[in-house]
């Protein structure tokens, strides 16, 4: 069995005590003091190596593209500012045209997203992972029936409220005294 010696070094200017282990064989104390670990410490795993091999070129190329885009934007801005000043009467119609073009591009993207979700729904339907169309129709019918019932109930409540207000207004008109020239009426 290996033994561990501990030697104490004291620095006259330092008031703290430093322990320095001496090793015989491969035994030490604590983590990282020469003891053999139970886990494999042979280096990076194959997943990490593959991620590095794939990630560095992809990340580098994306970083280069970002730099080129930034440089192009700065150069374009430097060239376009004097043109904006010279051709300012043309800029407003151009801005409107660009705004309409951007709106058209966004609408196109929205239509594409709608089409993609429709295709996804069809594929899920064909695979059988979603509800069938009759089940969806039954669910929609139940929801519509609930909505119609709710609207009917609210209509009845509103009709009752209006009727109560009409009776209340009629009752207050009967209990008041009205005096007209030539007649005196009193209702109670």
From Swiss-Prot:
Recorded topology in the membrane: Multi-pass membrane protein
UniProt feature, compositional bias: Polar residues: 172-181
N-acetylalanine carried by residues: 2
Keywords: Acetylation, Lipid droplet, Membrane, Transmembrane, Transmembrane helix
Main localization, broad class: other
GO cellular component: membrane; monolayer-surrounded lipid storage body
One Pfam assignment: Oleosin
InterPro entries, A to Z: Oleosin
Region named Hydrophobic: 52-125
Region annotated Disordered, chain positions: 164-188
Family statement: Belongs to the oleosin family.
Function: May have a structural role to stabilize the lipid body during desiccation of the seed by preventing coalescence of the oil. Probably interacts with both lipid and phospholipid moieties of lipid bodies. May also provide recognition signals for specific lipase anchorage in lipolysis during seedling growth.
Protein name: Oleosin S2-2
Organism (species): Brassica napus
Encoding gene (name): S2
């Amino acid at each position: 069995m290996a033994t561990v010696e501990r030697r104490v070094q004291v620095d006259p200017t330092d008031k703290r005590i430093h322990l320095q282990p001496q090793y015989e064989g491969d035994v030490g104390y604590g983590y990282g003091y020469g003891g053999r670990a139970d886990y494999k410490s042979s280096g990076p795993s194959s997943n990490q190596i593959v991620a590095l091999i794939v990630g560095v070129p992809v990340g580098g190329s994306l970083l280069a593209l970002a730099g080129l885009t930034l440089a192009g934007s700065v150069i374009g801005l430097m060239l376009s500012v004097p043109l904006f000043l010279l051709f300012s009467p043309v800029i407003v119609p151009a801005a409107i045209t660009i705004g309409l073009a951007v709106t058209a591009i966004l609408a196109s993207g929205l239509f594409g997203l709608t089409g993609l979700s429709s295709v996804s729904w069809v594929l899920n339907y064909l695979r059988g992972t979603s509800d069938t169309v009759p089940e969806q129709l039954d669910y929609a019918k139940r929801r519509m029936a609930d909505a119609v019932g709710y609207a009917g109930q609210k209509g009845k409540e509103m009709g009752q409220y209006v009727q109560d207000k009409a009776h209340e207004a009629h009752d207050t008109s009967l209990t008041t005294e009205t005096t007209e020239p030539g007649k005196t009426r009193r209702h109670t």
